[in-house]
Structures are given as structure tokens and as C-alpha cells.
Amino acid sequence: MGSYRIRIKQSARKELEAVSTKADRRRIIERIQALATNPRPHGCSKLSGRELYRVRQGQYRILYSIKDQELLIHVIRIAHRKSAYR
């Protein structure tokens, strides 16, 4: 299995910029980068009714889709756990 490319939706980039602390932003970025080598890490969940996956990073949730044929991960949303699924 090769390394996946990561594409981050523009709205997800804005959500990342809005994360309150620099340390949280750094950890979220590291978590997203780790998805390139392991798109389904321990602790990730497939969301029911959608072709999306979720990983937790502290109080934040990263929602993304995986296109195995293209070796592509598309980050859809980065949000605080209280508002991630709305």
C-alpha cells in the first residue's frame, strides 16, 4: 500500500485556522499528515449513512473521506466535538 495524498477542503482550512490554540492546530495537522500512511488508524470510526470517517484529536474531530482507487484522503471538516456532526 502506497502513501495517500491529502486534500483539505477550503472550509476545513478555515475551521483549522479558527482552532483556539496553536498547540491544538499543530496536533491536528500532525494527525492529518499521519493519515497519509494509515488512512484507517486505530480509533477511527466510519460514520453511519455516509462515506465519511472520523478521527479524534483532543476536543476536535476530523471528518474525511477515503478514495482508495486514487490513494486520496479528502478532509471535509475540522470541528470541536460539540459541533462536528451538525
Predicted ranges, named:
Residues 1-29, 57, 65-86:
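Enriched for short, Lys/Arg-rich terminal
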Residues 30-55, 83-85:
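A short, surface-exposed loop/turn module that caps and links secondary-structure elements
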